[in-house]
């Protein structure tokens, strides 16, 4: 029987941020994931919370990629009711042994802020998508002015040390690689994601604003 490791302090912080962020992004995820079907690849799946925003009967198979062993264990618990329609892979996207052009959808949520080479991740996602397949993205970006922008600048390095996340993230260059997407000539256009916020949270304020888009492979 596989040993399940307990979450450490930083893993608990990461899990709590994932859950809180997912609640805040509920409306955005319902909108973005509407229509997801077939074979779905999620990169940086964390504990698997996004599955609950899919129309699960329409998902033939969900492949989750997550490098953190402890989060993988949590993910297995989260999606146990989907049975053999789920594969949770502990590792990195470039290590995934799946055929090129074998997925109808690829999902990124708050991923590009925490990887060392966003361009490479987007290229790999593009490789796994079928022609006409869709990349669904929600990311947070660095604010451009005001108190939050200053706070993000001050917190950038300690926050990254604690969580692995760049709170001054800019996903546009990685997503805008030429020749990848239908109806994109130069730069990908990102839409502001709707947020649900019931009470002030300094941690979540640090991550705002959030943006979203769906890109279709040529």
Protein language model features and the residues they cover:
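Conserved beta-strand signature within the Rossmann-like core of class I S-adenosyl-L-methionine
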Residues: 133-140
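A short glycine-rich, Lys/Arg-flanked "PGG" loop and its adjoining helix->strand segment in the class I
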Residues: 119-131
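Conserved alpha-helix/loop element of class I SAM-dependent methyltransferases that forms part
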Residues: 19-39, 49-53
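Class I SAM-dependent methyltransferase SAM/SAH-binding core
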Residues: 41-42, 47-95
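Core SAM-dependent methyltransferase catalytic element
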Residues: 178-179, 187-218
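Short alpha-helix
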Residues: 163-181
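A short SAM/SAH-binding and catalytic strip from SAM-dependent methyltransferases
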Residues: 105-117
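A short acidic, Gly/Pro-enriched loop at the edge of an enzyme's catalytic core
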Residues: 94-106
């Amino acid at each position: 029987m596989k040993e399940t490791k307990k979450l450490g302090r930083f893993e608990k912080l990461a899990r709590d941020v994932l859950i809180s962020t997912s609640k805040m992004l509920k409306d955005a995820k319902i909108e973005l994931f509407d229509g997801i079907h077939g074979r779905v690849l999620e990169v940086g799946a964390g504990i698997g919370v996004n599955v609950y925003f899919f129309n699960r009967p329409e998902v033939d198979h969900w492949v989750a990629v997550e490098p953190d062993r402890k989060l993988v264990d949590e993910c297995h618990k989260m999606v146990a009711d989907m049975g053999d329609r789920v594969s949770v892979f502990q590792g990195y996207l470039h290590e995934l042994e799946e055929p090129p052009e074998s997925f109808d959808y690829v999902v990124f949520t708050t991923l590009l802020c925490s990887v060392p080479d966003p361009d490479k991740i987007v290229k790999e996602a593009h490789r796994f998508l079928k022609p006409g397949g869709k990349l669904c993205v929600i990311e947070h970006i660095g604010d451009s002015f005001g108190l939050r922008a200053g706070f993000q600048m001050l917190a950038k390095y300690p926050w990254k040390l604690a969580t692995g996340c760049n709170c001054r993230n800019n996903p546009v260059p990685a997503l805008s690689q030429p020749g990848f997407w239908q109806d994109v000539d130069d730069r990908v256009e990102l839409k502001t994601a709707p947020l649900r916020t019931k009470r002030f949270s300094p941690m979540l304020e640090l991550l705002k604003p959030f943006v979203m888009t769906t890109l279709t492979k040529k």
